[in-house]
A protein has these predicted regions:
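Conserved hydrophobic/aromatic packing and binding residues within compact polymer-binding modules
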Residues: 11, 25-26, 41-44, 70
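Residue-level detection of the helix-turn-helix DNA-binding "recognition helix"
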Residues: 16, 30-31, 46, 57, ...
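Recognition helix of helix-turn-helix/homeodomain-like DNA-binding domains
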Residues: 31-50
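DNA major-groove recognition helix of helix-turn-helix/homeodomain DNA-binding modules
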Residues: 48, 52-69
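Short, charged recognition helix plus adjacent turn
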Residues: 61, 69-86
């Protein structure tokens, strides 16, 4: 199964819904003590850079969205993968 980066896609969606640029999100993360710059956010949104749990929580806080909103359908995709590989 080809991996899909649901979190990156959802960060982009939630960031745009919040009316924030990548630069503004990076600035909010800096205020929270998380050093992620604009180019790193671009890589995250494109699925080119994985996230730590702390980074996911910080991004959710900066976007004022629940962590589960960022995870989206990740659990559903995982369960489908498990079923296919049993």
């Amino acid at each position: 199964m080809r991996r899909k980066n649901i979190i990156g896609q959802n960060i982009r969606k939630d960031r745009k819904n919040a009316g924030m640029t990548q630069m503004e999100l990076a600035a909010q993360l800096q205020l929270l003590g998380v050093k992620i710059d604009r180019s790193t956010i671009a890589k995250i949104e494109l699925g080119l850079r994985p996230l730590s749990d702390i980074e996911v929580i910080a991004i959710a806080r900066a976007l004022k969205t629940p962590v589960l909103s960022l995870l989206g359908e990740s659990e559903t995709l995982f369960n489908q993968w498990i079923e296919r590989n049993e």
